A protein has these predicted regions:
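Flexible, acidic/Gly-rich N-terminal and inter-domain linker regions that tether
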Residues: 1-75, 80, 85, 97, ...
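N-terminal start-of-chain detector that recognizes signal peptides
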Residues: 6-12, 41, 120-122, 170-173, ...
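Intrinsically disordered, low-complexity coil segments
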Residues: 6-14, 113-115, 208, 213
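Conserved Radical SAM active-site core
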Residues: 55-194
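Short alpha-helix boundary/capping motifs
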Residues: 61, 65, 74, 197-198, ...
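Flexible, glycine- and charge-enriched loops at secondary-structure boundaries
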Residues: 121-125, 211, 215, 287
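Conserved AdoMet/S-adenosylmethionine-binding subsite of the radical SAM
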Residues: 129-278
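A structural motif corresponding to the C-terminal lobe/cap of the Radical SAM core domain
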Residues: 277-287
Length: 287
């Protein structure tokens, strides 16, 4: 679903949100059919992340080499000399890019916020009110057998706007699922727990290669959620070399058993995760 950024008028007092994608009728992120909103920004830089462009506050320019026809209109349009051709190959100097979008406007194979374009700026800034106007027709279609899922990135990094969105959805009785790494402060989780029907708890960094320093904090967050009778679905990505090891799985099993979490979701690793690294110019960390 393409979310259209709209000019904010004086009557719209709702909070602004940054997001990079919206999926309608998803069946993988909560019960039933879901409208899934992918929010921009993440405090965790997982080696296996398949959306590295979601991590910064604003996503970098994505370049799909296979969709480029070599017309060179971007070269003429960009005053910062971001685009250049060397021996027929389209190269991008990302350090000079100010994300103005002029190159996208001139590219015949690009639309500013559409995946698959030759050039693409994924991050969209929109108010909560404007976002709801665009997604609510889909929510009404699926409200009896689905709901809304807030994913990312890490949605709760935009706390004030997320609270406004959650409060509206709660008032409308839409089922609300929220995905998190569990690495934010317990105070943040305490503020929104009454508004969330299901926590999709991504076990991204606990134990294993980089997780030791985070173990105690994740345990504290789980303790707090369990005490508030929150419904939690732990989700474990089966990443080769990280979460498919016996020692890691045993540690996770002990943690889940300690908190009486008897149902887990083992998510298959996205083998095509390298696509967004290629398009964003962000170096891959996986060995």
């Amino acid at each position: 679903m393409k979310i259209k950024p709209q000019k904010r008028d004086a009557t719209d007092t709702s909070h602004p949100l940054r997001l990079f994608d919206v999926a309608e009728f998803s069946v993988h992120d909560g019960p039933g059919n879901r409208v899934v909103i992918y929010f921009q920004g993440c405090e965790v830089q997982c080696d296996w992340c398949h959306s590295p462009h979601s991590q910064p506050v604003c996503a970098p320019l994505l370049f799909n080499y296979n969709a480029c026809t070599g017309c060179r209109r971007c070269v003429s349009a960009c005053s910062n000399q971001v685009h250049l051709f060397c021996e027929g190959k389209h190269l991008i100097n990302r350090k000079k890019c100010v994300q103005c979008g002029v190159c996208i406007e001139q590219c015949p194979n690009s639309i500013a916020a559409v995946n698959g374009s030759a050039l693409h700026l994924p991050t969209v800034t929109v108010t909560v009110s404007s976002l709801l106007k665009q997604i609510e027709p889909y929510l009404r279609l699926i409200e009896k057998n689905g709901g809304i899922t807030l994913s990312g990135g890490e949605a709760l990094l935009q706390l004030d706007a997320i609270k406004e969105l959650l409060q509206y959805c709660k008032q409308k009785r839409y089922h609300i699922a929220l995905e998190t790494s569990g690495l934010l402060s317990t105070e943040i989780y305490e503020q929104v727990t009454p508004l969330v029907d299901l926590w999709l708890f991504g076990m991204r960094v606990i134990t294993g290669k980089k997780g030791g320093r985070h173990d105690n904090h994740i345990k504290r967050v789980l303790d707090m959620l369990v005490k508030q009778n929150a419904k939690i679905l732990p989700r474990i990505p089966m990443v080769p070399g990280f979460f498919n090891r016996d020692d890691v799985l045993q540690s996770l099993a002990i943690l889940l058993q300690t908190h009486a979490l008897n149902t887990i979701c083992l998510s298959p690793w996205n083998k095509n995760y390298s696509i967004y690294y290629d398009q964003s110019g962000i170096p891959m960390q996986m060995p």
